[in-house]
From Swiss-Prot:
Domain of life, source organism: Archaea
UniProt keyword list: Cell membrane, Membrane, Transmembrane, Transmembrane helix
Primary location class: membrane
Annotated compartments: Cell membrane
Protein name (Swiss-Prot/TrEMBL): Uncharacterized protein MJ1155.2
Membrane topology label: Multi-pass membrane protein
GO terms under cellular component: plasma membrane
Transmembrane regions listed in the UniProt entry: 7-27, 47-67
């Protein structure tokens, strides 16, 4: 599969945002885990052509799922 310009720029933008989120010093534990998981799942959604679902998952659903997992432990 050949990456077109739009998909390539979208993926590089997402990776850049994910990397910058990890550089924030106050973001520890839950925040970093949420950023990593949400960022990678957003990348997967973007790769398959659903960028809005990726944004929804990364911004809203990922922190909720991680809070549920932490409350079970």
């Amino acid at each position: 599969m050949i990456l077109d310009k739009t998909l390539f720029s979208s993926l590089t933008f997402s990776l850049t945002v994910l990397f910058l989120l990890l550089l924030i010093p106050n973001l520890k534990g839950f925040g970093k885990l949420s950023a990593i998981i949400g960022g990678f799942i957003a990348l997967i959604f973007q790769y398959f052509g659903y960028p809005s679902l990726g944004i929804l998952f990364a911004g809203i659903l990922s922190p909720i799922i991680i809070l549920k997992i932490k409350s079970v432990k």
